[in-house]
Amino acid sequence: MASLKKSLFLVLFLGMVSLSICDKEKREGENEEEEEEHEEESEEKRGLLSFLPKVIGVIGHLIHPPS
C-alpha cells in the first residue's frame, strides 16, 4: 500500500511539473506573438506617416495650383 501511494504521488508530481512546463511555453509563445503583432502595427504606422506628406502636398496643389 505504501509503495502504491509513493507511485501515485510520483505520477502526480511529474504530471504537475510537465503541466507547469507546458503552461510556461504557452505563455512564452503568446508573448512572442504579441511582440510580432506590435512590430507589424508599428511598421504600418511608419508607412502611413511616410505617405501622409505626399497626400497633403497633392491636396495643397489641387487647392492652390501653382501660377
UniProtKB/Swiss-Prot annotation:
Acidic residues biased stretches: 30-42
Keyword entries, A-Z: Amidation, Amphibian defense peptide, Antibiotic, Antimicrobial, Secreted, Signal
A GO CC term attached to the entry: extracellular region
Expression by tissue: Expressed by the skin glands.
GO biological process: defense response to bacterium; defense response to Gram-positive bacterium; negative regulation of nitric-oxide synthase activity
Region Disordered, residue ranges: 24-46
Pro-peptide positions on chain: 23-46
S-S pairs: none
Secretion signal, residue range per the UniProt entry: 1-22
Cell location: Secreted
InterPro entries on file: Frog_antimicrobial_propeptide, FSAP
Function: Fallaxidin-4.1 shows antibacterial activity against the Gram-positive bacteria L.lactis (MIC=12 uM), M.luteus (MIC=100 uM), S.epidermidis (MIC=100 uM) and S.uberis (MIC=50 uM). No antibacterial activity against the Gram-positive bacteria B.cereus, E.faecalis, L.innocua, S.aureus, or the Gram-negative bacteria E.cloacae and E.coli. Inhibits the formation of NO by neuronal nitric oxide synthase with an IC(50) of 13.3 uM.
Family to which this protein belongs: Belongs to the frog skin active peptide (FSAP) family. Brevinin subfamily.
Protein's name in the database: Preprofallaxidin-1
Higher taxonomy: Eukaryota, Metazoa, Chordata, Craniata, Vertebrata
